[in-house]
Amino acid sequence: MKKILKSFFVFCAMIFFASCSSYNSVKRMQRMEEGVANPTTKEELEEAIKKYEKRAMDLALTDGQVGIWYKILGTRYLDQRLYGKAMECFKNAVAYYPDNANLYYYVAICAGYMAHTELDYEGNGASSAAIKKMNYLKLAENSYLQAISINPNYYRALYGIGVLYVFEFGEDEKAIPYLEKFLSTQLKDTDAMFVLARAYYSTYQYEKAVSLYDKIIELKPNAEKVQEAQANKSKVLEAQYQ
């Protein structure tokens, strides 16, 4: 009986290692056939995506690799300020990794930039460009919110949506909880303090705005910011006592 069991386990082990060897051989043959191993340049990444997308049904693991390459390619385009191409790469990467908060954040960043590059090239009137701009801004908003829903403490997305609400939508009240949460961990970020103080001022929360400007002055990030904080504080105090 022991000999039979021993023979059985040996047989199973042979099948397991043979399967692993076969799988690795397929991977090696695929790379040799397609000429894709470890792409690094934009051109190599684009070529790898094209080739592996066609063969994705061959090996399920290639799906994850394609998603990673889309993210890498997107960051390369983002570094070169090619926001449209970068955004498409990140959107494609989301299809492979729908629970990755970073990818939604990058989509939001690109959409925000694209909103400010939208011009009426086709001569359809200003309304056409305005609609496209708003669509990009809504995409940015939804992407930030999705990133935050995945990771509620994702401070970059918290700051991003705060800026979006204050400077793009003029919805300062919506920005406040996100910026407050951001500053609960990023205690010395004076840029966020300026944005939140502006939101407080716009919603008539003058004392909170003054308190933030005092904090900026106390932190002394640089002479220019201190001077701006002092000027803004005076403006708030003037409005408060009118």
What are these language model-derived features?
Residues 20-76, 80:
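N-terminal leader/linker segments that initiate helical-solenoid repeat arrays
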Residues 69, 103, 157, 192, ...:
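TPR alpha-solenoid repeat register
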